[in-house]
Structure formats: C-alpha cells, structure tokens
Regions:
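Conserved catalytic core of Hanks-type protein kinase domains
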Residues: 51
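Primarily recognizes Gram-negative and organellar outer-membrane beta-barrels
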Residues: 2-44, 54-232
Length: 232
C-alpha cells in the first residue's frame, strides 16, 4: 500500500531484492530427483524455472508412496511486468491417498481355567484432492491512478471408508459374539475471496484517495453413513 500511495502506513515488510543482469534474465534451469524401492514404493521431486526479460515462470512438484500414504503435488508460479500492467499468480494441485489394515489375535485366560479368543480386523482407506490458486493484477492507468485486484480460490473434496470386524470364541471355538461396523464419509468445500482497490494520487505531497472493496465466499457439504451390527 505504501508503495502505491507514497505514504508510510506503518506496515513494514522485509524484502530481499536480488537483481540480475539483463543478459542473464533468460533461459531455463531446474533439477530432478527420484528414487524407487521394494513393493513399488517411490519418491520423486523436481522443479524448473524459466526467465525471459521481465517474465518469470516456475514449476515444481513432488510425488511419493510409502505403502500406506501416497501424495502427489504440482504447482506453478508466474509473473509478468510491463509498463502499464503487472500480473502474476500461483496454482497448486494436491492429492493424497491412504490405505491401511490391521489384524489382531488375542487370548484371554479366565478364572475357571478356560480361555477366550478374540479376532479383530480393521481396514480404512481414503482420498483427498485439492486445488488452490491466487492471482494479482496491478494496472497503472496513468501516473496518478492505479487499480489492484487480488483474488484467491480454493476447492477440495474427499472420501473415506473404514470397516471393523471382531469375533469372540470360547476355548471350544464356539462363537460368543460378533461385531461388524462400516463407515463412509464424503465432503467437498469451495471458498474464494479477494480485494479490489482503486487509488488516485491528488498531488505530490502524499495526498491520496482510495476505494477498497472486499468479498468472501465459503460453501461446503459433508455426508456420513455408519452401520454397526452385533450378533450373539
């Protein structure tokens, strides 16, 4: 804000200003790393940068699978400056998958010299996907008038499932009770917000007039289904 109006608003920010020779502001650079292991487990990450005059483009991503969780992410940043217009933004897409299961066998010894056996199986899986983006635009209409617009967007959706089975047997392997339970859940959410500002310098002494507009929208849904049965 202080840069636009010329008036100190008290909100100081530490900025690291790196300047590169014009002859060096072009070309590509980047790196990539990857690894692969047993049971199709993997891990990879990479990035690439593009420079051309006053245009910057950066793309980066990661992916991994450790057997229980798998994650993928890719993002991009872009900026471009011209005499009248400065614009840019970033976007990121993410996905997470998880899958786990467990088995448990126990034996309990009772006071009447008998025992009980318990069997338990648990399984769960789920998936979450999300995308987020933010942009910035700055128009310099003339030497005194500037318009700035900064919107952001976020969207996510997911689902999860879980199941549980347990059974208790006596020492003669006769069932005493059995329990079964399942759960299913889905959700999605969308949100956006932004600001629009019009600034006009009145004179060279720091007097300005500004009009600011803000908006915010958030909407989401969630559904859950559960079923549990016990048998004796």
């Amino acid at each position: 804000m202080a840069r636009i109006t010329g008036v100190d608003d008290g909100k100081e920010e530490m900025v690291l200003d790196l300047r590169v020779k014009p002859s060096m502001r072009k070309g590509w650079n980047g790196n990539f790393e990857a690894g692969y292991g047993n049971d199709d487990h993997y891990r990879a990450k990479g990035m690439a940068n593009r420079f051309k005059n006053k245009m910057n483009l950066s793309i980066n991503g990661t992916a991994n699978d450790n057997g229980i969780n798998s994650n993928q992410r890719i993002g991009a940043n872009y900026s471009q400056n011209t005499q009248k217009l400065k614009y840019g933004g970033s976007i990121e897409v993410r996905e997470n998958k998880r899958d786990s299961w467990s088995k448990r066998h126990t034996e309990s010894f009772l006071s009447d010299n008998t025992s009980q056996f318990s069997l338990q199986n648990n399984q769960s899986d789920g998936k979450t996907s999300a995308i987020s983006a933010n942009f910035r635009f700055e128009w310099k209409l003339d030497s005194l008038t500037t318009i700035m617009y900064r919107p952001t967007f976020n969207f996510s959706k997911g689902n999860s499932n879980s199941g549980n089975f347990s059974e208790t047997l006596n020492n003669e392997s006769t069932p005493i009770n059995r329990k079964e339970a399942t759960n299913h859940q889905t959700n999605d959410r969308f949100s956006t917000n932004g600001s629009l500002q019009l600034n006009r310098k009145l004179n060279s002494k720091g007097r300005n007039i500004a009009l600011r507009l803000y908006y915010d929208l958030d909407d989401g849904n969630s559904d859950r289904y559960s079923l549990s049965n016990t048998y004796y």
